[in-house]
Amino acid sequence: MSANEPVSVHLLDREYTVGVAPDERSSLMAAAKLLDSRMREVRGSNRMAAVDRVAVLAALNLAHELQQLRDEQQARNR
């Protein structure tokens, strides 16, 4: 089992360092890129929007999409 390594990700021009297993690094980077994109969509042209509010709304949108995909998958498996 390999130890987590620190990786820097950028969300709305802020840097965050997180620990990740080496074999999951590319997946984490893709997730960070997706989240950054969604946060920018939520923020839109309102550069004064609070980062925490933007993050929560982006996370809620992504969670909603995930739930819809799970519901669709369950419906197909019935």
Model-identified regions with their sequence ranges:
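N-terminal intrinsically disordered, cationic/polar leader segments
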Residues: M1-S2
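Long, hydrophobic or amphipathic alpha-helical segments
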Residues: A55, A59-N77
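Amphipathic, hydrophobic secondary-structure cores in small proteins
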Residues: V9-N61
